[in-house]
Amino acid sequence: MPSTNRAGSLKDPEIAELFFKEDPEKLFTDLREIGHGSFGAVYFARDVRTNEVVAIKKMSYSGKQSTEKWQDIIKEVKFLQRIKHPNSIEYKGCYLREHTAWLVMEYCLGSASDLLEVHKKPLQEVEIAAITHGALQGLAYLHSHTMIHRDIKAGNILLTEPGQVKLADFGSASMASPANSFVGTPYWMAPEVILAMDEGQYDGKVDVWSLGITCIELAERKPPLFNMNAMSALYHIAQNESPTLQSNEWSDYFRNFVDSCLQKIPQDRPTSEELLKHIFVLRERPETVLIDLIQRTKDAVRELDNLQYRKMKKLLFQEAHNGPAVEAQEEEEEQDHGVGRTGTVNSVGSNQSIPSMSISASSQSSSVNSLPDVSDDKSELDMMEGDHTVMSNSSVIHLKPEEENYREEGDPRTRASDPQSPPQVSRHKSHYRNREHFATIRTASLVTRQMQEHEQDSELREQMSGYKRMRRQHQKQLMTLENKLKAEMDEHRLRLDKDLETQRNNFAAEMEKLIKKHQAAMEKEAKVMSNEEKKFQQHIQAQQKKELNSFLESQKREYKLRKEQLKEELNENQSTPKKEKQEWLSKQKENIQHFQAEEEANLLRRQRQYLELECRRFKRRMLLGRHNLEQDLVREELNKRQTQKDLEHAMLLRQHESMQELEFRHLNTIQKMRCELIRLQHQTELTNQLEYNKRRERELRRKHVMEVRQQPKSLKSKELQIKKQFQDTCKIQTRQYKALRNHLLETTPKSEHKAVLKRLKEEQTRKLAILAEQYDHSINEMLSTQALRLDEAQEAECQVLKMQLQQELELLNAYQSKIKMQAEAQHDRELRELEQRVSLRRALLEQKIEEEMLALQNERTERIRSLLERQAREIEAFDSESMRLGFSNMVLSNLSPEAFSHSYPGASGWSHNPTGGPGPHWGHPMGGPPQAWGHPMQGGPQPWGHPSGPMQGVPRGSSMGVRNSPQALRRTASGGRTEQGMSRSTSVTSQISNGSHMSYT
């Protein structure tokens, strides 16, 4: 266990700040125990620094459950530090000494339950309204700060001497709302608190229910169901209707207020703020109603304490004088009985005081006691002196000096008793007297009873504490399991999100890599096409240069041949003069040279036109090839995106199935745990009830045994009483006999005296014999009657107890059956809700997948459309430029065979497919591979004078770009292979409208 969690550890700075470092034994003196509970004791004390009266609650955190006790102390100290309200107890500090926390608070006179204990009768409605109004103001403050008291009852509603109402005992309070802990005192618990673990959370309205029960307690001296076993009361509250006021003497406003507080459904129950506007608490009432009530109570307490003092003084006096006469003692006791009955109604004790979850004195047992009625005054006085009541924490509150001054100055009796004293002197005396006087509305017998009660009834108190501890442990186990499963679910969801994110990142990286690859392919293709164009130009230029050289050589040979022919012709004609021959020969040479020059110029012009035309054709062919490559790359990219999206959707569906399986498994685990905890709880409840039944039967048997043991003494006293009556009768008869004998002796002659005496003697003997017979008969009849009465009474008590215990057991069974049914209904509801959530999530996922697929399809169509439109614009721009340069589209579309009839070293095919082979296109697939430039055409080269002959060997790829170009269709005339290929193309609009897109093959 970490040191910071160890009981009493102050290593945590936040915890250390909660406690003062001083030694409390040096700061507080004159400690007097005024209360006791399972947590420890409550003391009246005086602060030596300010001479201020305070109350100290000592709470030990050693022994069993020390860590739990320490946590309860820390929670209560934190709670007290947070609250500051006139209707809440004032916190002064907390000290630690020898594994005991000294919780110092203001001192008050007592609690509302003390009023009931002292007066032994219900409070008046106006007094209940005043107390309820003050308690409501304190509750409204707590609820506005999302805090819940969770232990509202008369014992925890305190009163100061000026008549101020204060809430106390925050050991059960919750600093968060809503909550779901099983805490409080059973008879005052709201149904949703009892069913907290089974049905969920609750809020501050549980205090409103407890306040309604407290109103009934103040009006009837005890809460509903108080004569019932505490465990049975819990079952009764959870499944039966709300209690109501029994008497008809209360006003309709009070009844409506109580009924509003005790609405079974929390949603129908008003809040504390709403109840502050109820006419019951807003009705006009005397301002001094609580002050007068407190003063009457103090007077009654003083009278009761004086009674106890006189009894003790009498006992001491008797002991000092060896005891007075019995008759005088009995007369004085009877007088004391009369005094006790005039000042108070007979108290009823309780063997059913149940401890609450609170660590305060008031919540260790209920503030009202209950025992069977006792008729004789002696038993009443014994109960008043020795029976056990519950002392609340109300006597642990300090009375402020200014409040004491106000009380003393505001008391008309104080002013009337000393009318001539100056105000300042009176105020000073009042202040000094209240500082020195131990003011309280609790009798000494109440304190003694509480201390004795804490020592007794430990078995019942421990049973309830164990039950509450079990409920807390079950709730903690369930919360631990829920947190564990929630962490597992979060971890699983995080892992799935991480897997999905990893896949998306991988897909993004792959797509980025593919795009870069495509960019590199396009750049490479551009370079290759540029090089091919240069090589193509160089090839044609080389061919043309070779042709030109051949042409020039041919001209030279022709020139020489023609020259020789001309010379021969001149030589044959000898008649022509030489000069004339020379001139004619020169002229012929010039003509030949001029003709050859013209032919050379014509050849150069045709070569230049051919070069420009072929280069333009080549560029158009390269443009179409680049378009085909772009289409292939876009198709590959879109197919890749489609594949990635399909894989992502498949993963989302798998993750949905995985989450669904985990959610159902978690729900099943929680429901199994809840069923097991309910089973253990019901088993514990049944065990506790059976133990309670055995204990009640054992107590009844013990009582009957004591009665049987006491019967001989009772019979002896009855026999002595009958014997005394017989003796008195004998004495009377003897006196009557003597009187009759004297009378007869006086009236009869002396001679008859002997006969008269004999007759009288016989008569006396006969009557005495009759008396003796009557005496024996009376004794026998008394013995038989007393034995029969005892047997009948004990048998009746046994039957009543058996019926009561059987009813409580049936009530427990009904409660447990209801809990099981509610648990099953809750499990079915949770299962249905989970199925609905899963179905909704699946539907949303499928809708998302459909939307993403539609978006991807739209993106695909848009990409294709934009690509085709851009390519069409490029073709159109190229053709427009060609027309401007004087090239016909028909001529550009029909490629010259001379472009492919001359191979050159390193020449490659013009159609490049980066994917490694001819792939499918948006149009009709081509049949056969493209033809390389280096392949010779059929029929050999044609003369340069006929450059525009038919092209038998045009590669089929050359028409591919034209076929896929919608603009080329409008520019190309019909006929020929190219026209056949282009006739199969469609426009961009028709391709998109017909759903033409890349295939996935």
From Swiss-Prot:
Protein location: Cytoplasm
SUPFAM superfamilies: Protein kinase-like (PK-like)
Tissue: Highly expressed in the testis, and to a lower extent also expressed in brain, placenta, colon and skeletal muscle.
Induction details: In response to DNA damage.
Residues modified to Phosphothreonine: T669
Domain Protein kinase: 28-281
Positions with biased composition (Basic and acidic residues): 375-388, 399-416, 577-587
One Pfam family matching this protein: Pkinase
This protein's GO CC annotations: cytoplasm; cytosol; extracellular exosome; microtubule cytoskeleton; nuclear body; perinuclear region of cytoplasm; plasma membrane
Post-translational modification: Proteolytically processed by caspase-3 (CASP3).
Consequence when changing D169A: Loss of serine/threonine-protein kinase activity
Location of the region described as Disordered in the Swiss-Prot/TrEMBL record: 324-433, 567-587, 911-1001
Keyword entries, A-Z: Apoptosis, ATP-binding, Coiled coil, Cytoplasm, Disease variant, DNA damage, DNA repair, Intellectual disability, Kinase, Nucleotide-binding, Phosphoprotein, Serine/threonine-protein kinase, Transferase
Subunit and interaction comment: Self-associates. Interacts with MAP2K3. Interacts with SPRED1. Interacts with TESK1; the interaction inhibits TAOK1 kinase activity. Interacts with MAP3K7.
Family classification: Belongs to the protein kinase superfamily. STE Ser/Thr protein kinase family. STE20 subfamily.
Name of the protein in question: Serine/threonine-protein kinase TAO1
